[in-house]
Amino acid sequence: MAVKKRGLGRGLDALLSGPSVSALEEQAVKIDQKELQHLPVELVQRGKYQPRRDMDPEALEELAHSIRNHGVMQPIVVRPIGDNRYEIIAGERRWRATQQAGLDTIPAMVREVPDEAAIAMALIENIQREDLNPLEEAMALQRLQQEFELTQQQVADAVGKSRVTVANLLRLITLPDAIKTMLAHGDLEMGHARALLGLDENRQEEGARHVVARGLTVRQTEALVRQWLSDKPDPVEPSKPDPDIARLEQRLAERLGSAVQIRHGNKGKGQLVIRYNSLDELQGVLAHIR
């Protein structure tokens, strides 16, 4: 169903004057068991205004394991949408994990929430969560701005962020799809992407690949962009090697009989590169691994 847009934020405060998603979730914890409904999981569907598309499979499996052992500790919040079906307002991870755990029903608090309020609540509450990646946050901000025809300042006020932060996040949407994928996977941080926005569109993707391959920091990325824009030959200063990583590279090289490089990122992610000069050398490496 299409939602009628509201001019420049008129009525947004009224939409949000009711309980927030967080308040509803707190209410669901304290609610009397007689008021809870145990809904068949197949009659519940994800919220269409939920900005998050991907969830960490490992974290989801951990939650599913907990639910198998202890059940769903916090009921989800849903709204009826007809045909004896329900749409999630809060608790999609719990619903997915419940399915993964093999349970047939899930405890839920059912609340009548109109479309426009559901949009505002879902978008604002999800933006204010800390576990969205920058691209998910940017897409949610754009959706909020477009649905209610808000200015950037009104969006900033609604979600409790500065206008500059909102503007920088919205600019991420203009990046090439390849860079958006790197952002979504955590290969690039928002600071990297913001720096790359200073390049022409045809060089942004090249710059992103350069940053990821060399493991550049945000500051080094900013220096790289300045260098490319000014066409100066001075190279970006490489980061000093971590002595612990260098020792580990040496130990692995000695064990495998081949050169090894560890590219360690800022968030614990990275790459292990094993170099070989011939198929025979590769066979030797594989023999050590087996």
UniProtKB/Swiss-Prot annotation:
GO terms for biological process: chromosome segregation; positive regulation of sporulation resulting in formation of a cellular spore. GO terms for molecular function: DNA binding. One of its GO terms (cellular component) is chromosome. InterPro entries: Chromosome_partition/occlusion, HTH_ParB/Spo0J, ParB/RepB/Spo0J, ParB/Sulfiredoxin_dom, ParB/Sulfiredoxin_sf, ParB_dimer_C. Keywords: Chromosome partition, DNA-binding. SUPFAM superfamilies: ParB/Sulfiredoxin. Belongs to the ParB family. PANTHER family: CHROMOSOME-PARTITIONING PROTEIN PARB-RELATED (PTHR33375:SF1). Involved in chromosome partition. Localize to both poles of the predivisional cell following completion of DNA replication. Binds to the DNA origin of replication. NCBIfam families: parB_part. This is Probable chromosome-partitioning protein ParB. It comes from Pseudomonas putida (strain ATCC 47054 / DSM 6125 / CFBP 8728 / NCIMB 11950 / KT2440).
